[in-house]
C-alpha cells in the first residue's frame, strides 16, 4: 500500500491526468517525469503546446543561426508548454547525445538539456535524433506528488520514446493510458477510496 512516507521512483515514467482533474494547466495532460527523489519531482508536459510558437520562432528570437543548417530539416515543430514553472526557460528532451553544457540523463533513451548549446545544433547534422522543445516545467515539492497519487489525480505508466517523441500530440493522453491497458475515455470523472 502506498503511504505518504514511502517514496517510489517515477523517473522515466508518464503521469497521466485522470479525467476528474480539471485544472486547465493539467487537464488531460501527460507529464514525462525527468527527476523524482525524496526532495520532490520535476517533469515536462508533453501534450500541451505554446500558442503560435515553433522551434524556428525560438531560434529566430534568440538570433541563433547555424552555418551548418540543413534546409531539409524542418524547424516548424511545435514548442510544448512544459509546465507553469520557469515558463520563459527552455527545457529540451532528446535522445541521448553527449557534449552539451547542462544535460542530465533520464534513461538510456532520453536526456534533458537546458543549455543554449543544444539549440545551436537544431536543424544541423549534429542535432539529436529526436527532440522535444518545451518552455517551463512542472514541479512537486517533497511528498506532494505522492499525495496527488493517493488522491487518484494521476495514473502512472513506464515511459516510452514512441509516445514521447512520435505519437501525434492529440493522441498522447490516450496512448499513455493504453500502456496500462486502459481506455482513458472509459474512466469515470469521479474517483473514490474504498
UniProtKB/Swiss-Prot annotation:
A GO cellular component annotation in the UniProt record: cytosol
Entries under Pfam families matching the protein: DUF179
Highest taxon of source: Bacteria
Database matches in InterPro entries: AlgH-like
Membership in a protein family: Belongs to the UPF0301 (AlgH) family.
Name listed for the protein in its UniProt record: UPF0301 protein BPEN_258
Organism: Blochmanniella pennsylvanica (strain BPEN)
Amino acid at each position: 500500500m502506498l503511504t505518504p512516507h514511502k517514496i517510489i521512483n517515477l523517473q522515466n515514467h508518464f503521469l497521466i491526468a485522470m479525467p476528474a482533474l480539471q485544472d486547465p494547466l493539467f487537464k488531460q495532460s501527460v507529464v514525462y517525469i525527468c527527476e523524482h527523489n525524496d526532495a520532490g519531482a520535476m517533469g515536462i508536459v508533453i501534450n500541451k503546446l505554446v500558442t503560435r510558437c515553433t522551434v524556428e520562432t525560438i531560434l529566430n528570437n534568440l538570433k541563433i543561426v547555424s552555418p551548418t543548417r540543413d534546409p531539409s530539416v524542418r524547424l516548424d515543430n511545435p514548442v510544448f508548454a512544459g509546465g507553469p514553472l520557469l515558463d520563459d526557460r527552455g527545457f529540451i528532451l532528446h535522445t541521448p547525445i553527449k557534449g552539451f553544457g547542462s544535460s542530465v540523463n533520464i534513461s538510456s533513451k532520453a536526456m534533458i538539456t537546458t543549455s543554449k548549446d543544444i539549440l545551436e545544433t537544431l536543424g544541423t547534422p549534429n542535432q539529436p535524433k529526436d527532440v522535444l522543445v518545451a518552455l517551463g516545467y512542472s514541479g512537486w515539492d517533497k511528498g506532494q506528488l505522492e499525495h496527488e497519487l493517493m488522491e487518484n489525480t494521476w495514473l502512472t505508466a513506464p515511459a516510452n520514446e514512441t509516445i514521447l517523441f512520435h505519437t501525434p500530440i492529440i493522441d498522447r493522453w490516450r496512448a499513455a493510458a493504453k500502456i496500462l491497458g486502459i481506455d482513458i475515455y472509459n474512466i469515470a470523472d469521479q474517483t473514490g477510496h474504498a
